[in-house]
Regions:
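Divalent-cation
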Residues: 2-141, 145-152, 156, 162, ...
Length: 167
């Protein structure tokens, strides 16, 4: 059991989430997703969670495991072309995970997603949260543009562009 991690999760609350991602940042992130999706046929969702609840924390749930749960809960997998991508941030751990549906995951390697995650985490270490998220959205969008180019006949928005603040 990692007591440092437990303490970090206990001390990282919803107020920290709102301080790091004020309304203006959330709007900028939403606009970045919307702009990105104009250039490809994929779907991007950004979700952020301040900290894990007690039981998952005591079971030492990883950010990756939690991201997979969130991917399912938000139904990112339920897009017409199986090209939904979740960018998940567990704020207490400053850990980013990218979970991609099978349509895009088959084309982009895990290592390529990892590069995006590490780049975002690097920005976060410098307190550049908004720009780090937007950089990640743009990087995911580059992959989606390559494998799922924009189709003017298929422009429906299947996932919310608003950042999902998990409580």
């Amino acid at each position: 059991m990692n007591f440092t991690r437990i303490l970090r999760h206990v001390l990282t609350g919803k107020l920290a989430l709102r301080r790091i991602f004020p309304a203006a940042s959330l709007t900028a992130i939403e606009q970045a997703i919307q702009q990105s999706e104009l250039n490809h046929g994929g779907q991007i969702c950004f979700a952020v969670e301040a900290a894990l609840n007690t039981i998952p924390l005591l079971k030492n749930q990883t950010a990756r495991e939690r991201a997979v749960e969130v991917f399912s809960q938000l139904r990112i997998w339920d897009t017409e072309h199986n090209n939904g991508v979740l960018i998940y941030l567990l704020l207490a751990d400053r850990d980013v995970e990218v979970i991609a549906d099978r349509g895009i995951h088959a084309k982009v390697s895990s290592e390529e997603w990892e590069v995006i995650c590490r780049s975002m985490e690097s920005a976060f270490r410098q307190q550049q949260f908004e720009s780090g998220v937007i950089e990640g959205i743009n990087a995911v969008g580059s992959h989606l543009r390559k494998y799922f180019p924009s189709d003017p006949n298929h422009k429906k928005n299947e996932l919310t562009n608003k950042p999902v603040m998990l409580e």
